[in-house]
Design a protein with these regions (language model features):
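Extracellular/periplasmic solute-recognition and catalytic clefts
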Residues: 46-47, 105-116, 132-190
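Gly/Pro-rich hinge or "lid" segments in bacterial periplasmic/extracellular proteins
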Residues: 52, 62-63, 68-130, 140-141
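Periplasmic solute-binding protein
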Residues: 1-11, 181-190
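N-terminal lobe/hinge region of extracytoplasmic solute-binding protein
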Residues: 1, 26, 33, 95-97
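Alpha-helical secondary-structure segments
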Residues: 17-26, 52-58, 100-101, 128-130, ...
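Surface-exposed binding/hinge segments that line
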Residues: 3, 9, 15, 22, ...
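Solvent-exposed coil/turn segments that connect beta secondary-structure elements
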Residues: 5-7, 21, 26, 52-54, ...
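Sec-exported extracytoplasmic/periplasmic mature domains
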Residues: 9, 26-33, 64, 120, ...
Length: 190
């Protein structure tokens, strides 16, 4: 059973309440095959609105990574009910109004995404007013942009942004803070 924080709104002003959670979970479950890689999807027996700020998730079996998997952006990033098309997401969405500290302001495919601070965010406010995420698929271009000062941050070092050799070289150089986070879950193949 989840007790939702009161006073939280989506960036479009709609309330984040148990009904919004229900709508989002219904859409995720309706698209179950897209998310079959996530075991939690197959463990959901039902979910229900208890009251305006209480939502209950019932699983088929005890499942230890439930809270970890609910924290995954994909597929559990919730959007405002106004973004749904006919109460569904199967055919896309009308917008991307969420409850987080950032609002997607502009997006140019394969170029960049511009995020601005969400003034109505319920938590600690962002220290920056805007962040531009550049798409730079070439490892050498990323490294050059970092050294020239064209980018302030490189996110990801598992081969999708910088290869690990470049990451280790940057860490040894000492000019930049460099860290690798712990994984959120471990799996064993026997």
């Amino acid at each position: 059973t989840f007790h939702l924080r009161r006073g939280v709104t989506f960036s479009d002003g709609a309330p984040f309440d148990a009904e919004a959670v229900r709508l989002n979970m219904d859409a995720i479950i309706a698209n179950r095959l897209r998310h079959a890689w996530l075991d939690l999807i197959n463990e959901i027996e039902r979910h229900e609105v208890v009251d305006s700020h209480t939502w209950r998730l019932v699983l088929r079996h005890p499942y230890y990574p439930t809270l970890i998997e609910l924290g995954l952006l994909r597929p559990f990033r919730f959007i405002s009910p106004s973004c749904f098309i006919g109460g569904q997401t199967r055919d896309g969405v009308r917008g991307l109004a969420g409850t987080g500290p950032w609002i997607l302001k502009e997006h140019k495919e394969n170029q960049y995404a511009l995020f601005t601070a969400n003034a109505s965010y319920w938590g600690e406010k962002p220290r920056l007013q805007a962040v531009r995420w550049k798409v730079m698929p070439d490892h050498q271009a990323i490294l050059l942009a970092l050294h020239k000062g064209d980018v302030d941050l490189v996110f990801g070092a598992d081969g999708d942004m910088l290869n690990l050799d470049n990451f280790d070289a940057i860490r040894r150089e000492g000019r930049y803070a460099a860290a690798i986070s712990q994984p959120i879950a471990s799996r064993a193949i026997l």
